Amino acid sequence: MNRTKGDEEEYWNSSKFKAFTFDDEDDELSQLKESKRAVNSLRDFVDDDDEDDLERVSWTGEPVGSISWSIKETAGNSGSSHEREQLKNRNSFSTYAQLPKPASTYSLSSFFRGRTRPGSFQSLSDALSDTPAKSYAPELGRPKGEYRDYSNDWSPSDTVRRLRKGKDKIQLLEEAVSMHDGNVITAVLIFLKRTLSKEILFRELEVRQVALRHLIHFLKEIGDQKLLLDLFRFLDRTEELALSHYREHLNIQDPEKRKEFLKTCIGLPFSAEDSAHIQDHYTLLERQIIIEANDRHLELAGQTEVFRKHPRKASILNMPLVTTLFYSCFYHYTEAEGTFSSPVNLKKTFKIPDKQYVLTALAARAKLRAWHDVDALFTTKNWLGYTKKRAPIGFHRVVEILHKNSAPVQVLQEYVNLVEDVDTKLNLATKFKCHDVVIDTCRDLKDRQQLLAYRSKVDKGSAEEEKIDALLNSSQIRWKN
């Protein structure tokens, strides 16, 4: 059928189908570019100074940057498949209010910035750029409790509340031990002590020796003797159990009750050495009770000279053995060996070494300025009846103690002369101004120069200076220098 040119144009213009031309794609591209230029031209209408004064809103009317806008922007692309199925099953003729609002592809902020919202189609400028766009959406739908572990937001009470199971508590203890920090281990043990039964705690610590030692030390420090005894009883540590039981005497103030308690400790399973100490402790307290009662009576009566001149400053009860010996040497030195308060009786009963006895007796008698007793303390007789002075502690220490108690020079010179080492003797004599000892020693050494140097240290015109001059002018001494 022949058609005119006008009929063909009318046909193609009236038909729903359009003929293909190569210019169509260029027309669409030109339209897209034109739209972009129109969008970008909006920036010219907004001054940079006024941009902060404008309130940016989304297509839904929500202010851009608000909390509700952020939630809707984030939740727009995270709708679940379950919600989509519900939307399909709903009546298509339902009202618009019942349908969820579709996520907006653009917002005013994205238009002004020239880019699309993350998750939507890219603009031409974004498509041509080499850098891919990234979006980070917070998980706003998750409750805070689910990501507390990641944000390190657990409070101490929440942490403790989580550790309700015994295995979690034991794991906590093992982690503390692995850190090798005593403070952390002790803190965990305090928590376990409060939250676990004794049987479970003891059983778990029995195989964890490091934690066990920390608990034992902690219980000793706080004085929890009851729990400590239960622990030793569970571990079958009989000797440590006995020692812990013995420590309870420190809490008993009454002397008679403490003595009776110590008596019950004698039969406990101690080592041989510890058993001897427990027996001595009981015997000493028994002696102290007797001595205290007798001396209190003598002091109140006022008939004993030593108690009148030197009143007691404290009770002898519960004092150490050395203090008790000093007390006896001070107030009861001359008593017979058969009495409980006699120093010799104490020495034999408790097997006090000679050095300790001499030191204590010397300090006590020197304090009383009883120089005759001091002299008798160091005087011994041999089997021929000859006397000799002997000091198990060394005479140099005797001189130091005597000088500390303000002994006169005559007494000091006697014991300085008994020092065997010449250099030590000269040093002590010079230090304590025992002039005769220095002069005689220099004469025996035939040391003229040292004697001449010492002459400047004595008082002019004194008897010591005259003695030195007489020795220096003597022709009978052959000086070595």
UniProtKB/Swiss-Prot annotation:
Subcellular location: Cytoplasm; Cytoplasmic vesicle; Early endosome; Recycling endosome
Ranges of Basic and acidic residues composition bias in the record: 141-151
A biological-process GO annotation: vacuolar transport
One GO location term (cellular component): cytoplasm
Residue numbers carrying Phosphothreonine: 21, 116, 131
Residues that bear Phosphoserine: 120, 123, 129
InterPro entries: Spe-39 (IPR040057), Vps16_C (IPR006925), Vps16_C_sf (IPR038132)
Membrane-spanning parts: none
Gene3D superfamilies from the UniProt entry: Vps16, C-terminal region
Record-level Gene Ontology MF annotations: protein-containing complex binding
Region (Disordered): 122-155
Pfam family, one: Vps16_C
Keyword Ion transport part of the UniProt annotation: no
Sorted UniProt keywords: Cytoplasm, Cytoplasmic vesicle, Differentiation, Endosome, Phosphoprotein, Protein transport, Spermatogenesis, Transcription, Transcription regulation, Transport
Family: Belongs to the VIPAS39 family.
PANTHER family, per database record: DEFECTIVE SPERMATOGENESIS PROTEIN 39, SPERMATOGENESIS-DEFECTIVE PROTEIN 39 HOMOLOG
Subunit description: Interacts with VPS33B. Associates with the homotypic fusion and vacuole protein sorting (HOPS) complex; impaired by VPS33B. Interacts with RAB11A.
Function: Proposed to be involved in endosomal maturation implicating in part VPS33B. In epithelial cells, the VPS33B:VIPAS39 complex may play a role in the apical RAB11A-dependent recycling pathway and in the maintenance of the apical-basolateral polarity. May play a role in lysosomal trafficking, probably via association with the core HOPS complex in a discrete population of endosomes; the functions seems to be independent of VPS33B. May play a role in vesicular trafficking during spermatogenesis. May be involved in direct or indirect transcriptional regulation of E-cadherin.
The protein's name: Spermatogenesis-defective protein 39 homolog
Organism: Bos taurus
